Amino acid sequence: MTDIATFVDRYINIWNESDPERRRLTIRELWQEDAHHLARTLEAVGHAGIETRVATAYEKWVKEKGNVFRLRGGVDGHHGTIKLRWEMLPAAGGEVISVGFDFLVLGEDGRIRTGYQFIEA
């Protein structure tokens, strides 16, 4: 795996990526084929499911509403896990709209095996 900061930067940027092909390729690089992305109200499984999840979030929050996702603070990781906080705010600037954190469990190949997403606000 590349260093944690680079990995997290790529992870955050995928949620802002407008190009579907670039999203698809990056998802395959970051997630294992049978990975799970879990949030309180949904479960996305495998590359196709995760691609749909990310594309849906992009369409709703970035493209339609003009927001951007970015890292909030530092990241931490050990024993094959990464913890990061993120925030969503208008791309043009303004107040933070939403805050959350993701906890990523990595496989032996350094790709995400399971990602847990928690919306805090």
What are the functions of these language-model segments?
Residues 8-11, 15, 31, 54, ...:
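Hydrophobic alpha-helical core bundles mediating ligand binding, dimerization, or RNAP-core interactions
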Residues 59-121:
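A beta-strand edge to alpha-helix "cap/lid" segment located at domain peripheries
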Residues 2-30:
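Short acidic-aromatic low-complexity motifs
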Residues 24-80:
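A solvent-exposed, acidic/Ser-Thr-rich amphipathic alpha-helical stretch
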